[in-house]
Regions:
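Bacterial N-terminal signal peptides
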Residues: 20-31
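Positively charged n-region of N-terminal signal peptides that target proteins for export
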Residues: 13-18
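Scaffold/interface architecture of coatomer-like assemblies
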Residues: 33-326
Length: 326
């Protein structure tokens, strides 16, 4: 893979929806995941435990909307409007679990080097001494390359320890990384995955992983390391090809969307930089919204709306109410 400056980021727009029936089948997994993280999440407290969701808002041109207030939002829970008990929009420290795919497929077309390039840009976007990141690698298992740290120089130095080898347990690794970052004290937390999207060895499906990450309100961002011909946003994409993701990327795009995250492409040095910047910028401008959970136990699909009808809000798909859920 040859990297040259001047190419634009291919950003995938539009929200894919997972059928409500899927959420019902995943209730045990959701409840277990939320029970694990219940005491770890940076949540609001107001007499009772509140459901906390993070949301990003974009206007009709895809630009982040950064100046909304509590009165501009409404929460719809199972078709009913909920009162917003707490609201935050101020800038806050970030905590990122940066997850490298080091499977054998990443050793072709220089994808591993491209992933390190994108990670370097991610770390450059962090504020020294304020934001933190941890580096993790996976093939058939998850491995900690560097613990969570605010020392960006140390994090960059650890990138040299990432080398491709083995099978791919992508979905399992995302699940494990989400649990790691959910334990961090920062309110703005996310998993950023650098991968070609090929999974050969996971036990968990993308739907199961997205349900687990959504349950603990950890958005998953995918930076797909692909060739320019496979990048829907590249002017070197295959002529006549539809502007859709390659087959190996489609399922993890759903995974990212369901958690409130997003999919970006990295096929050139410029698009790697743009993807890293877009992820961090979005996380810095999350709105944190808290409300009392519904009384009925089980899965609660939620929708966050704004008073501006042309604004698009992205957030997790719902939560589980009951003793184990939040």
């Amino acid at each position: 893979m040859t990297y040259s400056f001047g190419k634009e980021l291919g950003y995938v727009r539009g929200m894919r929806r997972i059928l409500p029936a899927l959420a019902i089948t995943l209730l045990p997994l959701l409840a277990a995941a939320q029970g694990t993280a219940e005491n770890q999440q940076a949540t609001f407290r107001s007499g009772v435990d509140l459901v906390t969701v993070s949301a990003t808002v974009r206007d009709g041109k895809g630009r982040l909307v950064k100046d909304l207030e509590k009165k501009d939002f409404e929460v719809i829970d199972r078709g009913e409007r909920r009162i917003i008990n707490e609201f935050r929009s101020e800038r806050a420290p970030l905590s990122l679990a940066i997850l490298f795919d080091v499977s054998g497929s990443m050793d072709t077309a220089d994808r591993a080097t491209a992933a390190k390039f994108a990670a370097h840009h991610l770390i450059n976007q962090l504020e020294e001494g304020r934001d933190e990141a941890g580096l993790f690698a996976f093939d058939s298992r998850l491995r900690e390359v560097a613990p969570f740290s605010v020392d960006t120089r140390a994090l960059k130095g650890a990138l040299g320890e990432v080398d491709p080898f083995g099978a791919t347990s992508l979905h399992d690794a995302i699940s494990a990384a989400a649990e790691r970052v959910a334990a961090r004290p920062m309110a703005r937390r996310a998993v950023v995955v650098l991968t070609d999207g090929i999974d050969t060895a996971s036990r968990l499906t993308p739907a199961q992983v997205s349900a687990k990450a959504a349950a603990i309100d950890v958005p998953v961002y995918i930076i797909a390391v692909v060739l320019p011909i496979d990048d829907p946003g590249s002017d070197r994409a295959t002529p006549g090809a539809t502007r859709t993701a390659p087959a190996s990327i489609g399922t993890i795009e759903d995974l990212a969307r369901w958690t409130g995250g997003a999919l970006y492409y990295s096929s050139t040095s410029a698009s790697a930089y743009q993807a890293a910047r877009a992820v961090v910028d979005e996380l810095r401008h999350l709105y944190l919204i808290a409300f009392e959970p519904g009384a009925a136990p089980g899965w609660h699909p939620i929708e966050i709306r704004t008073s501006q009808k042309d604004f698009v809000v992205r957030t997790r798909g719902g939560y589980v109410a009951g003793p184990a859920g939040r």
